[in-house]
C-alpha cells in the first residue's frame, strides 16, 4: 500500500537492473576478477532531492549471487546515494548501503557424528552486509528520467563471517546495469 502511494506520487518508478561479477577480494585492489561468479540485482530508487545537475536518493534492492566454490547468497537492503550529471549525459554516483545476506553452501559439508562423517543439512547463514559503491553512467537523453547505462564498482562485507577466525569477509562486485522509469513518467509535465 505505501509502495503504491509513493509510486503514484512520483508518476513512474525509477528502477535499476544489473548483472555483476562477484569476488572475494580486498576492496579497491582489483577491478575485473576471474573466474566469473555471476549475480544480479534489482532496485527501486526514490529521490530525496532532485536538482538539475544532481540528486540525492535512497534505493531498496534485492539480489542473488552464485560463487561456485564458496556459497550462493540472497540479499535485501538499502542504499543512500548522490548522483551528479553533466549536460552531455555522463554521470557519477556514490552510495553507502546496508543489507541482510542469507548464504547457502554450494558444495556438500560433512560433520563427524557417532564415529562417522554424515552430510550436514544447510539451513543457511544470516549476515550483515555493509557496502560502498562508486558508479559512472551515461544517460541517452537529456530528460531527468531518461534511460541510463551504468558500471558500478561495489565493495561490501559479510559480518560475522566465521566468528573467532575471519570476522569480516570482504567482497567486490562489478555491475553492468540499466536505470529506467517503470510506468508513465509525468514528472516533467
Residue ranges and their predicted role:
Residues 15-23, 58-64, 78, 94-102, ...:
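Transmembrane beta-barrel strands of outer-membrane/channel proteins
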Residues 22-28, 47, 51, 62-69, ...:
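Sequence/structural signature of outer-membrane beta-barrel proteins
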Residues 8-60:
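Short glycine/proline- and aromatic-enriched beta-strand/turn motifs that initiate or cap beta-hairpins
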Residues 1-16, 182, 186-189:
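Bacterial Sec-dependent N-terminal signal peptides
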Amino acid at each position: 500500500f505505501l509502495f503504491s502511494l509513493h509510486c503514484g506520487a512520483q508518476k513512474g518508478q525509477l528502477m535499476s537492473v544489473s548483472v555483476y561479477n562477484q569476488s572475494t577480494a580486498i576492496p579497491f585492489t582489483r577491478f575485473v576478477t576471474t573466474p566469473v561468479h555471476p549475480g544480479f540485482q534489482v532496485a527501486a530508487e526514490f529521490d530525496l532531492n532532485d536538482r538539475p545537475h544532481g540528486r540525492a536518493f535512497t534505493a531498496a534492492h534485492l539480489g542473488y549471487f552464485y560463487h561456485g566454490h564458496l556459497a550462493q547468497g540472497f540479499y535485501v537492503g538499502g542504499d543512500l546515494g548522490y548522483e551528479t550529471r553533466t549536460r552531455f549525459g555522463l554521470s557519477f554516483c556514490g552510495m553507502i548501503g546496508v543489507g541482510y545476506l542469507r548464504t547457502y553452501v554450494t558444495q556438500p559439508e560433512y560433520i563427524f557424528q557417532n564415529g562417522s562423517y554424515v552430510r550436514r543439512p544447510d539451513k543457511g547463514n544470516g549476515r550483515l552486509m555493509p557496502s560502498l559503491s562508486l558508479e559512472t553512467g551515461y544517460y541517452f537523453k537529456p530528460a531527468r528520467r531518461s534511460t541510463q547505462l551504468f558500471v558500478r564498482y561495489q565493495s561490501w562485507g559479510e559480518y560475522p563471517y566465521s566468528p573467532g577466525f575471519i570476522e569480516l569477509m570482504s567482497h567486490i562486485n562489478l555491475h553492468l546495469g540499466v536505470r529506467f522509469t517503470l510506468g508513465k513518467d509525468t514528472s516533467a509535465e
